[in-house]
A protein has these predicted regions:
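DNA-dependent DNA polymerase catalytic subunits
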Residues: 2-43, 48-344
């Protein structure tokens, strides 16, 4: 709303002007230098970082000390902003997030602290962890990676966790229940032949007329290999029971490309330079920085620039982290062997 936007602009201006380049006195840590910066605002929330420094040395303040100072200054800033608002309007301190990952508008994750800097819980919004059309294995894998990043901030450990998860998937050790997706069947589809679980319900009805799922029933299905690449979704899914009875092959590549990959591309794309650093690919980092400068010079609209950057980073992450597993699945399906097999 217009009022919400005005409040965000007001809070941004107040905090950045008052704490933008200021030495502040704190209760437990004496004087600290603030370089407050607006991060994100939406409807009735606004996010800032204080970019804390030692006022004498200029050294950045991080970790637990930064968390404690931020909680104190954020409450102070909220009270200051409220003084100049007409009641009942107020700017209320809600939470401090450390670490904090902002993926896009209304999509973020972080360790949430309120007033106690020693009591934090993981908070996420708008992520695939909550989507009903996500299988449990995505939630397990994504959640495990986020847990590593939130608690240890170790990107290499997060990548190793991803690799182990992908290996477990393609080796067939993931329980089918973890790959199943459940959707409710309705009776009012405009184009029912394009609705995968409706087509599956029809197939079940033909196989067993007395047990055709009815509108309102929740249908559980798993994706299976179909050699026809143009096949519609209804011909790519089956019930877990039918898969076991007929020894069908689960389509693991679908779970990588359509379930795991997209949300994880976006997440790891934010750490692309760190990944290249671990792999000692300095040339890739130089090329990336050059490409980003060129992109920034050709696109003036910030939102469009961020979308193009995300697309660029996602493609690089696919190559770095996912392609070797997709190739392995393809080889197993076609009977091809890698050249290393001949020297094993």
């Amino acid at each position: 709303t217009a009022t919400g936007r005005m409040m965000i602009i007001y809070a941004k201006r107040m905090v950045e002007e008052v704490y933008g380049d200021r030495v502040c006195k704190t209760k437990d840590y004496g004087l600290v230098k603030c370089r407050a910066e607006y991060i994100y605002g939406d409807t009735d929330s606004v996010f800032f970082t204080f970019n804390l420094e030692d006022p004498e040395t200029g050294e950045k303040i991080r970790g637990q000390k930064a968390l404690e100072i931020t909680i104190e200054l954020a409450q102070e800033a909220a009270n200051l902003c409220t003084q100049f608002l007409k009641a009942p309007q107020c700017l209320e301190y809600e939470k401090t997030l450390m670490p904090f990952i902002l993926l896009s508008k209304k999509r973020y994750v972080g360790m949430l602290y309120e007033e106690d800097p020693h009591k934090g819980d993981m908070k996420y919004m708008g992520l695939s962890l909550k989507r009903r059309d996500s299988c449990d294995y995505l939630k397990d894998t994504y959640g495990g990676i986020l847990n590593i990043l939130m608690k240890s901030d170790n990107i290499q450990d997060a990548i190793e966790y991803l690799y182990q998860s992908l290996n477990n998937l393609i080796e067939g050790t993931v329980p089918m229940e973890k790959l199943a997706i459940t959707k409710a069947l309705r009776s009012d589809y405009k184009n029912p032949m394009q609705i995968g679980h409706w087509v599956l319900a029809e197939k079940i009805g033909k196989r067993d007329p007395g047990n055709r799922p009815k509108p309102g029933d929740r249908m559980k299905f798993v994706f299976v290999v179909n050699k026809d690449k143009k096949a519609l979704m209804g011909n790519k899914i089956e019930t877990p029971e039918y898969i076991v009875q007929n020894n069908l092959t689960i389509d693991y590549s679908h779970y990588i490309t359509n379930q795991l990959m997209k949300p994880l591309q976006q997440l790891f794309g934010l750490a692309l330079e760190h990944i290249w650093s671990y792999q000692k690919k300095t040339g890739a980092i130089k090329t990336f920085k050059k490409d980003m400068v060129n992109l920034e010079n050709t696109i003036s609209d910030m939102e469009l620039f961020m979308k193009r950057k995300e697309k660029y980073c996602s493609a690089k992450v696919k190559t770095l982290l996912f392609d070797k597993f997709l190739t392995k699945i393809q080889h197993s399906q076609t009977g091809m062997q890698t050249i290393t097999k001949f020297f094993a």
